[in-house]
Amino acid sequence: MAQLVKAAQAGFDEKNDALVTVEPIASGIEIELTSKVIRQYGNQIKSVVLNTVKEAGFDGVKVIVQDKNAWDYTIKARVLGALERGSKA
């Protein structure tokens, strides 16, 4: 399993994008989501984040997503970018 060594961010807090922050935690995967469309798409966004973290082989990660109506592929790219930045010392 891959591990984060530091907190990191990817993305922008702008329309049609997402700002994703990852932080190392002891174990597991925690997701904190802020979105105007959380009622309609909250479960889908969380699923994309969770699957992306698992597929990348990470554990011990808190993912904070500030969504501004981003598409799934954008969220996935932002999560992967933040994980990559956070895994480098």
Where in the sequence are the language-model features?
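N-terminal intrinsically disordered, cationic/polar leader segments
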Residues: 1-89
